[in-house]
Amino acid sequence: FYPTPPEIAGKLLSGVNWDHVESILEPSAGRGDLIEYALRRNGSSRNHRYCRRDLDDIDCVEIDSNLRAILIGKGFRVVHDDFLDYYTRKRYSLILMNPPFADGDKHLLHALELCEHGGQVACVLNAETIRNPYTNSRKLLSRELKKHGASVRFVSGGFKHSVRKT
């Protein structure tokens, strides 16, 4: 579990177009840092629909039972434990994620499957996953990102001030 540093969350969320966000998923949610940052950031905007009372539109997935308990205690709906075997008919307009770097490619590919047409996925990944597509899943991810016209930004040292270092 590597909490997303606020600086990285800010950069990740700066690229989100909130105009058409109807549903949010945070897979591998940890303590819900990304979604909480998004709520704080947008809660001050009068015309933004997300605030504490709208948590019915937000789903979280978390494999660690202690972290699931924290999410539930914060009022978040936890819909599943292992994101890689989370299947639902629901499609999300926004997926915010900081998946485990070891399987980041698989997590991002699965997120693309759960994203509605025209939706957005904002993801923190190890740069090596993108720069070195040596596995079949990384090659597929590279093709999918090109197909979707994904915007990729590389941030050096993004986790050097985090609670847990990468």
PLM features: residue spans?
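Class I S-adenosyl-L-methionine-dependent methyltransferase catalytic core
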Residues: 1-166
